[in-house]
Amino acid sequence: MASTDTYNPTRDDFAAMLDESFAGGNLQESSVIKGKVVAIEKDMAVIDVGLKTEGRVPLREFAGPGRDNEIKVGDTVEVFLDRIENALGEAVLSRDKARREESWGKLEKAFQNNEKVFGVIFNQVKGGFTVDLDGAVAFLPRSQVDIRPIRDVAPLMNNSQPFQILKMDRRRGNIVVSRRTVLEETRAEQRQELVQNLEEGQVIDGVVKNITDYGAFVDLGGIDGLLHVTDIAWRRVNHPTEVLTIGQTVKVKIIKINHETHRISLGMKQLLDDPWQGIEAKYPLNARFTGRVTNITDYGAFVELEPGIEGLIHVSEMSWTKKNMHPGKIVSTSQEVEVQVLEVDSVKRRISLGLKQTMRNPWEVFVEKHPVGSTVEGEVKNKTEFGLFLGLDGDVDGMVHLSDLDWKLPGEQVIDNFKKGDMVKAVVLDVDVEKERISLGVKQLEGDPFAEPGDVKKGAVVTCEVLDVKESGIDVQIVGTDFNTFIKRSELARDRNDQRSDRFAVGEKVDARVIQFDKKARKVQVSIKALEVAEEKEAIAQYGSSDSGATLGDILGTALKQRDK
């Protein structure tokens, strides 16, 4: 049988209660009032609030997460008066509503003053959790539970802890709180305190907490510092995992502290001597050293000369002849190579190295083996609009310009006689070692007809062979020479009626007089007309005079007979 606690009032108590009863007429529904526990029956508390009848409140309404729920007869409690009297003649009371009203007032004040409030997480709902704020129920979004996502929230349940109110609407009864904001604020305060105890230049032990592509975060005992990948070692570190592992204890030096953002920059290499000190003396210009290839890029290869000291071989300094080849096809990672120091910049911490400088310049070697004027043979590697490129000894190329293909024919015409892969002989005309150029000539394999023209000179009479007959004139070659020229129609005869190209046939030989021989312009011109005019003048001078009475025909006839004899 369930026990029942009963409160037996004294005569004075009855008098006081009678006074309160008369005062009960001033009580209003939907307000918070005080009452006294007069009995506890099973799971109900009987409360006298000074009305005609007592009200009953479930004991569970006095319980709650994080609260002592034991009440006893004689306790004074605050309850919410829902109705003065129900159908059974009893006062309708609620402890929950009283607490909620009281709590909302406190919460609104805390919200306005941006103060923390205490509550208990007691249930999980969609998207988050419900929190009891001393009678008022608030919503805690999952994203506001902690600074980082957590899987197990059980340890956080049913424990009184601080929260920050993010927003609240009393009319709708909505309250949203955050535990994360409180943690962040607490952490910021802790960070501030920790930062105050740290100094730039201080050496401290830490634990590697996280590793990224750009560095590692090190826990310094409640506050993290960033160890950038460039500050791990003096040598090149492509990724922090080459040196560090999560959980590893490392000794670091505090490089910089930003007291506003609480960011701390750390360094490991700063604990060691700077290998770049006195670098110019260690690696003088043009000196040669052996190093190891550590990294290859599109623009060159990095070579480690000693721990912490690397230099770059630019792609342009890798080979004398392999101009457009990727560095990875010339050297390989970890390969030992001999390099020459080209430039040292201690301020920017850069060393420029050369690989090709450790080998002889192939153009110097070529000119030693093949001086200007010597004959070489090479394979046609390319044909362009301005000449031929021949592959020569020493993996160098030489160019035959169009103008150096033939003495007589235009280069644009002659170049069609060559194709890729042909082996061609040529004369070395010039070697420019600095510009890495070799000039060759094919026509120079034969003598220059203008250099040794023989009897061909201006005014000389020459015999020509007809090569081609055209309406505008005839193409001829001076017999016994390499001179080809064109006799235009006006120069075919002295008499206008005889200036016809159809008078001549291919293979026919004709005499003509040289009227132009220009070595500089490389031009020779002959004329049959000029020869006839000269012969006419000579005949008149030799066989006739102005007063002889002989006709021009008689004089020429006599001259021709004399020549034939």
Curated annotation (Swiss-Prot):
InterPro entries named among the record's database cross-references: NA-bd_OB-fold, Ribos_protein_bS1-like, Ribosomal_bS1, Ribosomal_protein_S1-like, S1_domain
GO BP annotations, alphabetical order: translation
Cysteines joined through disulfide linkages: none
Pfam family, one: S1
Keyword RNA-binding: yes
Superkingdom of this protein's organism: Bacteria
Keywords from the named record: Repeat, Ribonucleoprotein, Ribosomal protein, RNA-binding
Domain (S1 motif): residue spans on this chain: 30-96, 114-180, 201-269, 286-356, 373-443, 454-529
One GO MF term attached to the UniProt entry: structural constituent of ribosome
GO cellular component: cytosolic small ribosomal subunit
Listed SMART domains: S1
PTM (free text): The initiator methionine may be removed.
Family membership noted in the UniProt record: Belongs to the bacterial ribosomal protein bS1 family.
Function of the molecule: Binds mRNA; thus facilitating recognition of the initiation point. It is needed to translate mRNA with a short Shine-Dalgarno (SD) purine-rich sequence.
PANTHER family: 30S RIBOSOMAL PROTEIN S1, SMALL RIBOSOMAL SUBUNIT PROTEIN BS1C
Protein name in the entry: Small ribosomal subunit protein bS1
Species in which this protein is naturally found: Rhodopseudomonas palustris (strain ATCC BAA-98 / CGA009)
